[in-house]
Amino acid sequence: MFKIIPALFLLISSTFLYAESNVSTEQEIQIFDDTHRVISEYVYDISNSVDNLLSGEFFKEKNEARKNVNYKDEDSLDAFFQTDKFKSETSQTYLRMRIESNNQSKTSDKNKIKLRAHLPLSKTKHVLKLFLKSKKDNNTTKNDSNTKNAKTIEFNSKYSIGASSFKPYLKARYFIAYELGNNWSFEPAQTFRYSYNDKFEETTDFYLDKKLSKVQLLRFQVSRHTKQHHSGMDYNFATQMFWKLPKKSAFSVSQNFWGNTKYKYDLNKPTYGGISDYATSFNFRQNVWKKWFFYEISPGVNFHRMYNYKPNYNARFFLDIYFGRTYIR
């Protein structure tokens, strides 16, 4: 991971360094492309090696050629906005560098540079599925006639390792999608996550989606979350509307209600189990250069119990650079 940092710095600064030289624009772009390609291949090779090692295929596929994979979810609005749902369920390998500016009326402004890595364990998942299937077959009774006629539900699963700001984690997600008809779909999901800093945490999500058109999606989401060494249970109710726009851009509106069953921000006051934060946000995101450079603008307002539910206006700005097998629109 640390080998990538100098290359990242080179990628960002090379434009300014070459702007004062006599190098042509085409050469500058080629330098960007070459640097991005080297980092992306490095990220993918690490992910593939880890997956091969955990699945027992490290020596079999050590010299496996890199393949161009077409992901069925790469044109979805979840993929474009990089929602938590997409990041938990995608099979893509990527490293994201985010330059973030967060300005709020109630607190001081925050500017950060974040690194996030996602390495899917697709081959390891396949080995686990074969293992569980063999166990199931060994325990199958002779009464197969009823079993064949019974309607079964097959759960999907995703396993991955990753890092958020150099904090590694392991993640497992189990989910199933129901098509309800009339362009409605329902998906319950359960996620387990373990990291060195946050220890064990788990999240339950319920998504109810309505595809209004090819470029519009309405979503209702209910979530709950618990974390080791943290009191109470977090919960969230959200309504979101997504639109695809021309010129590789998209827009969304979100209304969220957050709470905790044992919320406490003042030691002299009892815990509070109701809604502690109401938030409305607007997001505009655009792919501005190549297939891996995005920006996002997100103004909004929230009403938090900490501020006696007085409005806290905020404006966030992101610059996202992706490496690896990333979202392509």
What feature does the model see in each segment?
Residues M1-E20:
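Classical Sec-dependent N-terminal signal peptides that target proteins to the secretory pathway
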